[in-house]
UniProtKB/Swiss-Prot annotation:
It holds the Pfam family S4. The gene is rpsD. The lineage of its organism: Bacteria, Bacillati, Cyanobacteriota, Cyanophyceae, Synechococcales. GO terms for biological process: ribosomal small subunit biogenesis; translation. This is Small ribosomal subunit protein uS4. The keyword rRNA processing does not apply.
Length: 202
């Protein structure tokens, strides 16, 4: 499944608040469509699917990418669900979003793709790059790059920077000190349901 580029509020009406996808709030609390307000009992599969979709849309990853992350999370020690969230949180586009360099994950991805971001002094335009402890993520030393980041930092998508990122606003750079702790994940998600969804598929 390709990356979603349609109306974002349509997604948040169906799945709830997705801080990585959009900062706008849906005016209606029920799903879109003719039967949006109808109350139906959802199956266990539907509930798991919904949690999986939350993860996909919030972090802006394709189905194929998410399957790869699930496999990586399984191969690591510890809880598969927590490992999965940490892998997604440490993507370069998401790190830029959490630092406030981009208003949303798609906005931060655009910064990365257009060459406005460096990692350890080198321009890195791969949004899926896994930031590691010790990496220094910074805005490129160009006027247009700095203006974009400074404008976004005035109105960040999320108020607080996670503890595994040490931000220097003056230098528009940050050091990655580790992996994101579970309590700093902004998305309201039951990651165990996502793991269960893929248990028979991967």
């Amino acid at each position: 499944m390709a990356r979603y580029r349609g109306p974002r509020l349509r997604i948040t009406r169906r799945l709830g608040d997705l801080p990585g996808l959009t900062r706008k709030a849906a005016k209606r609390s029920y799903p879109p469509g003719q039967h949006g307000q109808a109350r139906r009992k959802r199956s266990e599969y539907a509930i798991r699917l919904e949690e999986k979709q939350k993860l996909r849309f919030n972090y802006g990853v394709s189905e194929r990418q998410l399957v790869r992350y699930v496999k990586k999370a399984r191969a690591q020690e510890g809880s598969t669900g927590t490992n999965l969230l940490k892998l997604l949180e440490n993507r370069l586009d998401n790190v830029c979003f959490r630092l406030g360099f981009g208003p949303t994950v798609p906005g931060a991805r655009q910064l990365v793709n257009h060459g406005h971001v460096t990692v350890n002094g080198r321009v890195t335009d791969i949004a899926s790059y896994q930031c590691k402890p010790g990496d220094v993520v910074a805005i490129r030393e160009r006027k247009c790059s700095k203006q974009l980041a400074e404008g976004n930092l005035e109105f960040p998508g999320l108020a607080n920077v996670p503890t595994h990122l040490e931000l220097d606003k003056a230098k528009l750079s940050a050091k990655v000190t580790g992996r994101c702790e579970r309590e700093w994940v902004a998305l309201e998600i039951n990651e165990l349901l996502v793991v269960e969804y893929y248990s028979r598929k991967v």
